[in-house]
Design a protein with these regions (language model features):
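Generic recognition of short, well-ordered alpha-helical segments
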Residues: 21, 50, 68-72
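FMN-binding flavodoxin-like domain, especially the glycine-rich phosphate-binding loop
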Residues: 3-4, 29, 33, 59-178
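Glycine-/small-residue-rich active-site loops that bind phosphorylated ligands and cofactors
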Residues: 15-18, 44, 62, 94-96
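A short, aliphatic-rich alpha-helical micro-motif
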Residues: 49-50, 81
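N-terminal beta1-alpha1 ligand-phosphate binding loop
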Residues: 3-33
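Short hydrophobic segments within beta-strands
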Residues: 10-13, 39, 89, 126
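A short beta-strand-loop structural module common to alpha/beta enzyme folds
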Residues: 33-45
């Protein structure tokens, strides 16, 4: 008789789709071991957290902040989250710098978790992707200015992917063991 799979809810909040890409990658890697439902925080369909054993929340940062729906989700579901095994990852370009690539040193994940007063069982941070060609002109210029100040990439014709997929795989293995 096989062991019953745990139920994992994977939720994401994304601006440009990369948080979704990472969550779908995690789903693919974990589907043999867990029963998984994946959904966007932007979807109208509300998942009942009580139906799941574990929750992974992935969220991107834009202009220094996680999206409003991430703050709202954690605040509105804090009581239920505290009863579950939880994992959270933040996706931000600041994490491309080694000194800001850990959950303890990345200012955006530190600030977010403090503000919502949540301490997930597993925390990760990834540098993500900068897709200049898909940005509209005002966003492209704003991010170009930020990259100029922070010594980041300035080639507007390219997609710059800083995702450390080995770190993503490490997070997935940790989730497998939750």
């Amino acid at each position: 008789m096989s062991e019953k799979k745990s139920k994992l809810l994977i939720l994401y909040s994304t601006v440009d789709g990369h948080a979704k890409t990472i969550c779908e990658y995690a789903q693919t890697k974990l589907k043999k071991d867990k029963d998984i439902v994946i959904a966007s925080l932007d979807d109208d369909s509300e998942q009942k957290l009580a139906d799941f054993d574990e929750i992974l929340l992935g969220a991107s940062v834009r202009y220094g902040f996680h999206r409003k729906n991430v703050y709202e989700f954690v605040r509105e579901n804090k009581e239920e989250l505290l009863k579950k095994k939880t994992a959270f990852f933040s996706l931000n370009l600041t994490a491309r710098k080694p000194e800001k690539a850990s959950p303890d040193t990345n200012p955006y994940i530190v600030k977010f978790l403090k503000k919502v007063d949540w301490d997930p069982d597993l925390k990760s941070v990834f540098a993500g992707r900068l897709d200049y060609p898909s940005l509209n002109c005002p966003n492209r210029l704003a991010i170009l200015l930020i990259m100029a100040i922070t010594n980041g990439p300035k080639d507007l014709s390219k997609v710059h992917d800083f995702t450390n997929w080995s770190k993503v795989d490490e997070m997935i293995e940790s989730i497998r063991k939750l």
